[in-house]
């Protein structure tokens, strides 16, 4: 996958997912959490492949509108029965069926906090071949689990809203 595009290279350079302490503890107690956790790395690798395909298409003669997805496991589709059943894939299929095909560039990462989106995911938008038509950002659950102190969480999400491209769709918990 390396060598195709700066975004693809950045995704390939990410270290493997490491579960948070709470996730590790819950996985010891729950087979369901253990099995969902086992899908995280394969799902992320599949998104990387799809991003590479979308960027290759976007750099060709046909330039479909770009939909960039940022965020955490909700944007990855973790917990769905397959990558095709996550909300991003389902909405992408519905748009395609309605005659509005988009190239998806899913830069999300399971376990991401709002600061990860700001510091790691948003800067990758500078490497898109052209401006995204849609940017969706779904994050907040991991922020809440890590530090539920409301004023701090509110400041983080306000900072994210300020850093996001104009017209982004931000969904948080």
PLM ranges: what are they?
Residues 78-83, 116, 147-151:
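Short, solvent-exposed loop/turn segments at secondary-structure boundaries
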Residues 1-69, 77-81, 96-100, 130-131:
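N-terminal secretory targeting modules
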Residues 119-173:
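Alpha-helical cap/lid subdomain in secreted, periplasmic
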